[in-house]
Amino acid sequence: MIFIEKYNNKKNIRFPFFKKVIEMSINRNFKTFVETGTSRGKKKFFFFNKMNWKDGMSTLMFAELVSEIRGELHSCDISKKNIDNAKSFTKKFSKNTFFYINDSVDFLTNF
């Protein structure tokens, strides 16, 4: 789980929470992760290859996690633009990461 430390940045104020969630998930052998509201990203963020800490990094962190543990991430957002951005910056984890354009309540009801 060494990968998680690269997300430990002073601007990532949620890092301790994400780290704890990931540790607990690994200890419990969770393989399926469901996210409502994907990381949005910005073109500037991707063009300069800088982390957008204010946008939350959950999609990228969970995508990398499920790639390592051979699990699955299912991420839902109502915005096609947000989904397209998230697909772009998680493409190297696309084998284990799935995106859905949908209202989160509908998505969770039918998941």
Question: In which residue ranges do the predicted regions lie?
Answer:
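A short alpha-helical cap/connector motif
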Residues: 1-111
